[in-house]
């Protein structure tokens, strides 16, 4: 009797042990097979090829533009072209120096007008960004200012030129045209870009830096100038360079606000000034130069187009130099870890 009881107890114990045992999972069922691995590799290779082709397609217009400009512009781009203006240039005839005119006046006009626009727009845009991020974050005023900045970023460039022309006509008299007027027109186009880029860079600065400075008793103004702006300086400089590249190629507002002359004008506040984009437009609109039947052999009918391509190449090089300068400045003044 006792043996039967023991056997039944052993059987019940075995059954309970079997029921309480953890289930055995066969992981071999989840192991990828060779066909699955090969399919994954094919998909990975396909995506790599598609991404590379997309990159190549995106590069084709840029490379084509650069090659076309270099091939057509390098023929006329020389020292004489860079150091002379269009004074005494008639048709396709050579001047007394043996050249065919140049872009010295356009280079000076471009640099002065762009510098004037930077002096106006960068302080205004940077102070606006500091106010939006450090003082008025999330309130009603900041939302209104952001809306106005978004509206300004969508203003056509010709409208900015018309505004500057109308404003100076009211302040200085009808028909007033000078380089500073062009700077005002370009500053209207630069300010939204400076505000947006600076605003994003200031938001990236960690709040821990602000809180640590304030905990040490540093004033808010000094925290902004010495810590926040210093930390965000590389991004701010890049945004300003982007804004300059945005406006340095504008033509329509400068045709209205700054005009076009053949001589060199160094005075930003008096008289018309020529910029490189306006120069390209003026030369391209000529299509060809007039060479009469009795003209000398040095007369070149295609000289306007050659000058236009050379000026366009100079403008591209100028933008490239500005980008390099901006990167150098950002690297020099950036915060370095010790």
Please describe what each predicted stretch is.
Residues 1-104, 108, 112, 292-317, ...:
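N-terminal, non-cleaved signal-anchor transmembrane helix
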Residues 116-149, 170, 327-335:
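Transmembrane-helix boundary motif in ABC transporter permease subunits
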Residues 150-188:
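Generic hydrophobic transmembrane alpha-helix motif, especially the helices
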Residues 100-131, 240:
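Transmembrane alpha-helix signature in integral membrane proteins
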Residues 118, 197, 220-258:
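Transmembrane alpha-helices
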Residues 46, 103, 107, 111, ...:
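Hydrophobic alpha-helical elements at and bordering transmembrane segments
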Residues 124, 137-141, 206, 210-238:
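Amphipathic cytosolic juxtamembrane alpha-helices at the membrane-cytosol interface
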Residues 254-316:
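Interhelical loop and adjacent transmembrane-helix boundary motif
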């Amino acid at each position: 009797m006792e043996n039967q009881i023991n056997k039944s107890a052993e059987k019940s114990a075995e059954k309970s042990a079997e029921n309480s045992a953890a289930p055995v999972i066969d992981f071999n069922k989840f192991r990828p097979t060779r066909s699955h691995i090969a399919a994954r590799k094919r998909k990975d290779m396909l995506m790599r090829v598609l991404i590379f082709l997309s990159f190549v397609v995106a590069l084709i217009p840029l490379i084509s533009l650069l090659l076309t400009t270099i091939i057509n512009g390098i023929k006329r781009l020389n020292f004489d072209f860079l150091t002379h203006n269009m004074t005494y240039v008639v048709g396709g005839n050579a001047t007394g120096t043996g050249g065919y005119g140049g872009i010295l006046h356009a280079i000076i006009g471009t640099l002065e007008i762009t510098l004037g626009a930077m002096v106006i727009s960068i302080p205004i845009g940077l102070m606006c960004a500091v106010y939006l991020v450090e003082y008025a974050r999330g309130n009603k005023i900041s939302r209104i200012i952001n809306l106005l900045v978004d509206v300004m970023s969508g203003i056509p460039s010709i409208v900015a030129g018309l505004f500057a022309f109308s404003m100076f006509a009211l302040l200085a008299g009808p028909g007033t045209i000078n380089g500073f007027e062009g700077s005002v027109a370009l500053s209207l186009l630069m300010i939204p870009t400076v505000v947006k880029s600076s605003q994003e860079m200031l938001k990236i600065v960690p709040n821990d830096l602000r809180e640590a400075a304030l905990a040490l008793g540093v004033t808010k103004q000094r925290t902004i100038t010495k810590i926040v702006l210093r930390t965000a300086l590389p991004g701010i400089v890049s945004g300003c360079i982007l804004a300059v590249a945005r406006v340095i190629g504008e033509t329509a507002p400068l045709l209205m606000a700054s005009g076009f002359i053949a001589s060199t004008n160094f005075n930003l506040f008096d008289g018309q000034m020529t910029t490189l984009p306006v120069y390209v437009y003026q030369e391209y609109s000529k299509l060809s130069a007039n060479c009469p039947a009795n003209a000398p052999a040095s007369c070149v009918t295609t000289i306007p187009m050659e000058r236009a391509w050379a000026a366009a190449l100079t403008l591209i090089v100028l933008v490239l130099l500005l980008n390099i300068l901006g990167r150098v400045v950002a690297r020099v003044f950036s915060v370095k870890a010790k």
